[in-house]
Curated annotation (Swiss-Prot):
This is Catalase-peroxidase. Bifunctional enzyme with both catalase and broad-spectrum peroxidase activity. Its cofactor is heme b. GO terms for biological process: cellular response to hydrogen peroxide; hydrogen peroxide catabolic process. Belongs to the peroxidase family. Peroxidase/catalase subfamily.
Amino acid sequence: MSIDYKKLWPEALDFESLDQNAQHVDPKDEDFDYAEAFQELDLEEVKQDIESVMTDSQEWWPADYGHYGPLFIRMAWHSAGTYRTTDGRGGASGGYQRLPPVDSWPDNANLDKARRVLWPVKQKYGQNLSWADLIVLAGNVALESMGFETFGFAGGREDDFAPDESVDWGPEEEMEASDRYDEAGELPEPLGATVMGLIYVNPEGPDGEPDLEGSAANIRESFGRMAMNDEETVALIAGGHTFGKVHGADDPDEHVGGPPADAPIDLQGLGWENDFGEGKGPDTITSGIEGPWNTTPTQWDMSYIDNLLDYEWWPEKGPGGAWQWTTESGELDAAAPSVDGSSEKEDVMMLTTDVALKRDPDYREVLERFQENPDEFQEAFAKAWYKLIHRDMGPPERFLGPEVPEETLIWQDPLPDADYDSIGDEEVAELKEALLDSELSVAQLVKTAWASASTYRDSDKRGGANGARIRLEPQRSWEVNEPAALADALETYEAIQEEFNSARSDAVRVSLADLIVLGGNAAVEQAAADAGYDVTVPFEPGRTDATPEQTDVESFEALKPKADGFRNYLSDEAERKPEELLVDKADLLNLTPPEMTVLVGGMRALGATYQDTDRGVFTDEPGTLTNDFFVNILDMDYEWEPVSEDREVFELRDRETGEVEWEGTRFDLIFGSDSRLRAISEVYGADDGEAEFVEDFVDTWSKVMKLDRFDLE
């Protein structure tokens, strides 16, 4: 058995998130194009196949009410609902619900059966239909089959075949524990759920108690971290709870076995074995809470909202030993059908999280408005559901299939279509010359391009240089972008753009988004030339400029970096070690350890640092693309001494004279301290390493500049 080095040396830097960016664990051919394969599907045929299995109840796991639709809705919701805005991680893409740890979360109990029911559909369409898409599509088909009109569906989610090691799910080591709140009672970022192993909040209430006010507060915080406002939150909960029931025929602690990750091998990946009664149908145990929300659990109607608002609800312990709510005088007892179609009736119940919506004045106002306006409720749920299941997919260019709505919504970060011709090689050369002849230095050109492009997050495919949103709020006011200096730089860019565009007699124009990237490319080429290397940085025009109306300021605020080690920037809000934040930023940029290393070394050589600090600029020729950063970080003629107790800034001193040569931060020193990063740095810091360094920097720089160019795929 290999040693778990993370436990042996917990302070060592963890590169698992970056390593997965370099690994190919997908059994499909590396040249396989899922987008192309998906569009070969007859989506209507796929939906018919899903609906067929949805109403074909299996003896080994009977469908509640003869219809797997409610189970499929829960499956789709819990797949997409892991998304959080703070770092863009989670969500339906990747199909992580079928992989650990998510497949074994208590909140996903018995969803393994839902995926097994769907296997014949997945088996039929194979590589043309990912699990990630199928899970979400099944939720949509379920809603439609029970009388609800959905807003649309987009495919394009590829499957992953290993857990996402970049996601911080929380500090707890036990499921359903909640040790994540800080001393001030705040849920730390980037977490979205309030409890380990749950998608959002404890349905019984905070800490398993029926506290309505506390439950409403948890709901608002958790759904807010998923980018949902109060109306969307109420619409999602009310819409989802219109269907199906929860299962708690008896106490899960006494009757239910472990999740898939802990199940015996003969169960073949099925978890939560239940020895109560038949272990299925009316005897099913999932959450430990028991009952439906209404008397029509397989049809779209207003009964959930009507029941919640029109009756008084009181807490009680259900048959599974969990807190749930019943009507005050039992008006809805024995009112709902049994899951197996028998003559025995079931009691209608509510969760603490349901009644919390009624107690909270803001949520209640939305509920009452929906009750009075059913069409408004239908539309709100349709759009909130669409947002839920597509939030992590990025811009509309990635949305595939015949059911993609024509309307682009603000949360999709829309961009305008170009109503002009893009620049060609001749114009590119002309504009490069104008940029290099301007008052902007190499460092300014590089920093502006980096600030624009490095907002990209591969987690949810948001951000990037396309749109030139760096000139709009909130990005132009972010501390990391040095607002005053950025404003001056943008003024120069806009003047060059205006002069070029106004001089054209044809339809060729340059967008500011393209011009900013081109400026960075030109600066890199100039810096390489000054170091003796003739390079051309690849450039593909076609970016357009977003408008303020196309930019949700609050939504984009989630992209603001608390640290950017590539620019040697660390804010007061940063709560983790700088080197850990550097790795996290590199992962969001889909970089590997060598790519992260070469970018930092190049940015330092170019002098592209926050507030033009000399920290980390280990060269006498800033603005020249040399390997000096690596040469000097590896030089044993020097030693490092901290200049403060927090050991975040250090002085590089000559061992013999004690003279201070340079200053650096933990962002810099990690490349000499960490054994893996030092090994990579040695390649670039060797006497024959500079040419390789320049080539690799150009390749990686170009990669970052076009991370968001889904229009080129």
